[in-house]
Every structure is written in C-alpha cells, then in structure tokens.
Amino acid sequence: YDAIIVVTYLYYPAVKSIVRVKDKAIFIPTAHQEPFIHFKMYEEVFEAPKAYVFLTDEEKDLVQSLFHIEEKPYEVMGVGVTVPDNVDPDAFKKKYNLDNYIIYVGRIDEGKDCPRLFQYFMEYKKRVKSDLKLVLMGKAVVEVPQHEDIISLGFVSDEDKFNGIKGAKALILPSKFESLSISVLEAMTLSIPVVVNGICDVLRGHCVKSNGGLYYKNYFEFEGCLRFLHEHPEEYKQMCLNARKYVDDYFQWDDIMAKFDRIIEKVGE
C-alpha cells in the first residue's frame, strides 16, 4: 500500500497499528477536547503518522497545540452528507401531531449533556409562554423527564428523521465534545439552523463560520437563542439560507476527495 488511513485516536486498533505503519500512515484522529487526549501514552501515537486529515480547523488547532506535529503535512476537510431529494415535514408533523418544535437527533445520554438540555428546556417552559416542544430521536440511556412538551420518539426511520429535522425550528445539540457532528451538517443541508453548546469549539465554529446557528454556554444564553429564533423572523430566514450555503461551500464530496488525493500523493512521495 502507498498509504494506510487510520481513523479515530481513542481506540486500540489505532493505538497499536499507527506506530507500526507510521511512514505510510494518514491519521484522521477525530479528536476533541476531552480527558483522554491528555494521556501521555498518546504522544507516541500522534507523533507517528506521516500526514494528517482533520475534520475541522478547530480539531487541527487542538492537536497542533498538544503534540509536536507542526512539520507534518495535513489537509482540513469534513465529510459530505446525503439527504433525500424529497423531504416532507408536513407528513412528520401530521404523523406525530407536532407543530412548533426543536429536535435532538442521536444517543440520549449524559455524554451528550442531555440531562442539562432537559433541565434548560423545562426552565424555559416555566419562564416563557410558548407552545414549543422538544422532540428527541434516538436511544435513551438516561431517563427522559415526564413532561408534556418533551417528546421522545426512540429509533425512527430515515424518512421520519429527515422529515422531522426539516420540520423543526432548529436542531439542537447540547454536547460539549464533538469533532464534527453529522446531525448538524444534515440539518444545515436541509436549511435548518442549529443551536449548540458553545463550550464545544467545533460546534461553536460551525455557527460562527456559517451564521447559520446559535450557541449558548449557560441557561440564559439558551433561552436567548430560542427567543431569537422565534422573535426575529427575517433573521431566521437568512440563517436558514446561510446554513445551507455553509454546507455547499465546505462539505461537498468532490472537494473532499480531491483533498484526499493530495494527501495520499504526499505520503506516497
């Protein structure tokens, strides 16, 4: 092989393989700020590969700040996302008797900061007169509060997922630790703004670079995000356009594969 692509720094296959194939290794670490990346054992892992592929600028900055890899070639690219051509939000709303809602898509657990999302949303419902609901899609591994405005659908079909995202006021992602987030890119591809945890550099970066999302770091900023979406309709329309443009500009497969070709050529030289 001219090059061997190793994906995700955290697990055994990457840790053991990359030091053996380092002269041919292209490393896609999918790294984010978390305790594990600071373990001393990872110094050898991150300094081994010939080249890097980062999913975002924020990931690149993090890895370069932690390890001595300044001289290694790299490319920054995301991933492309594919959504159906025909999406029917009205069918989703009719099926589940929903109208005004925000949506969370993914594993419902503490690692994604879902308990804090529930806390913030219930506080919002106490403080703000609104018919807004929170719709959850995915496996719940933490308890979902019994609340009339929190709707947990469990696993759903791809059709329901995309219809549901398209019908939402926004997709919300409360996670503090993300290296990219496919669900955020899927929502933006469907011209749906996102509301994310601003503690996560990558998610905050999506919002800042696109002007297609909002971020929060505490309850009052969370409330402010939801109020803004509902109280500024013209700005909301522009956010929808901005979200789609961001994906079109930076997350297209043709561009991504061209970057892959370049980095593979560098490793093979």
Regions found by a protein language model. Give the residues of each.
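Nucleotide-activated donor-binding/catalytic signature segment of Leloir-type glycosyltransferases, i.e.
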Residues: 138-163, 167-170
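Aromatic "clamp/platform" in nucleotide-sugar-dependent glycosyltransferases that forms part
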Residues: 176
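Donor nucleotide-sugar binding/catalytic pocket of nucleotide-sugar-dependent glycosyltransferases
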Residues: 24-35, 42-87, 98
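Short hydrophobic beta-strand element within catalytic cores of glycosyltransferases
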Residues: 193-197
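Conserved donor-binding/catalytic core segment of Leloir-type glycosyltransferases
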Residues: 53, 93-112, 118-122, 240
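A short, well-ordered alpha-helix in the C-terminal region of glycosyltransferases
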Residues: 206, 228, 235-249, 259-262
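Short alpha-helical segment that forms part of, or immediately flanks, the ligand-binding pocket
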Residues: 162, 180-181, 185-189, 203-208
